[in-house]
Amino acid sequence: MMRNFIVVMNILALTLPFLAAEVQNPDSNCREKNEVVYDVQRVLYTPVSSVLNRNHYEPIYYHYRTSVPVSPYAYFPVGLKLLLLRSPAQILKWQPMPNFPQPVGVPHPIPNPSFLAIPTNEKHDNTAIPASNTIAPIVSTPVSTTESVVNTVANTEASTVPISTPETATVPVTSPAA
């Protein structure tokens, strides 16, 4: 009984969005609603393999669309909802939709590389760069470190808490002076 209930609820959960969409969007072929007609046509698929094999470092003159991975030698019915403001008799039966991109405007030329700054082999004056001594003498400087020493005193009259007193020691550290 519980299994049947779960199956029915899953079926309802999967079909309710589709039923709600049909109720919200009734058939638009009614002539009373703004005279809008939708048509489904077949589209001619034109493959171009050079788009897939193009070098990515070439200049891009056109906006490329991705190719559909299907057989290039067959016609595929594609459901297109075309907004028709004229009679369906004026629409062509076949509309070729190429797979390769169409030019969007005037292609932009590739700039000549003459505007790039190319270094020459001319020798420049070295007097502008002052000579500096990169070897610095090593000077030892004393660095004080603090070490904590724990002294435990065995006094029966005092508490048993250990007493810690810091001791300082001077350790010479060598470092290069700038």
Swiss-Prot record:
Subcellular location: Secreted
Glycosylation sites: 141, 146, 152, 159, 174
First and last residue of the signal peptide: 1-21
Residues bearing PTM Phosphoserine: 159, 175
Site (Cleavage): 115-116
List of residues that carry Phosphothreonine: 120, 145, 165
GO cellular component, one term: extracellular space
GO BP, one annotated term: protein stabilization
Domain of life: Eukaryota
Entry comment describing in which tissues the protein is expressed: Mammary gland specific. Secreted in milk.
Keywords annotated in UniProt: Glycoprotein, Milk protein, Phosphoprotein, Secreted, Signal
Family: Belongs to the kappa-casein family.
UniProt-recorded name of the protein: Kappa-casein
